[in-house]
Amino acid sequence: MRIAIDARELSGRPTGVGRYMTGLLREWTRPEQRHGHEFLLYSHRSVENSASGSVRTLPGTGGTFWEQRTLPAALAADAVDVLFSPAYSTPLFTAVPRVVALHDISFAARPEWFSWREGLRRRVLARRAAAVSRRVLTISQFSKGEIVSRFGIDPAKIAVIPPGIDSPIPAAGEADPPHLRLQKGEHLLYVGSIFNRRHIPDLIAAFTQVAARHEDAWLHLVGDNRTHPFEDVTARIEASPVARRIVWHQYAPDEALRALYRQARGFVFLSEYEGLGLTPLEALSAGIPSLLLDTAVARESCGDAACYVPLGSIGAIATAIERLLYDDSARRTLAAAAPATLARYDWATAARDTLALLEAAR
């Protein structure tokens, strides 16, 4: 088979979908996974991690016009057998069978988190993509339920295939980057783009309470600000009495991120809506316990290997952070549950099952 892949998310800085595609493509380079298929990667500019397939760079900006007009013409010219669209939308008018991945549908569940134009674009394209594709892939039972209830898609059409997890544990002997000067102490880490649904102001407020009691506590925020309506993260940090111990890394290259994971004693991710929530699982794979909001998808993804707090309770969040950083007994309990949780997330299994889905969609 000639399998086409929309590879736009592999260009530029890595994204969540880009890392997801990198994990699948890495497995598909292995002879036992490839099954003799040819992979054709399509993008509007050069892509990273393309070893498993030939890259077709097509002119354009990579926006909706590119996806709906330029890409279908190239698919027809290359006589591909199936198209995998890993990022929420797909060409709506093509004879090529399609499989689309909808990792979450926050833009439909909580439209107030998006500008009206962007939210409308996402809702229309994702709903139509799910309707015209042979199969829909998602990463959790929670997301499957959301797609069924909000888009009216037949449950039998939706496949749940959890991704693998890439451990951020650094290589033995790897030194910290010279520009990253980490102070001694107990470091709490957040990694992920900053959205309103992830409640960074609550995290800063709760950490401020903890840091007032513990002079060795540090908070590191890693991620760019994508809030809508806009939240001024810098102002929130500067208003904290412990602002000097709150460090915001708007972007961290891989070596810096590995160093932050190496120093972290706890991970916090106060998100009220995710398709799965990969960064807490990555932290767990590095031996770092996580604190999450108590949501259905958080329970599904991390089970007994995380501690949970209710939305909006700053005091409860502060108490849980304190346990995460300073209560060795609580940390051991969470660590004991980690292997069973992590066993559900394996790239070889995800790649095999995704390839089987593409084969069946032909």
Predicted features and spans:
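Carbohydrate transferase catalytic cores enriched for Leloir-type hexosyltransferases
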Residues: 1-362
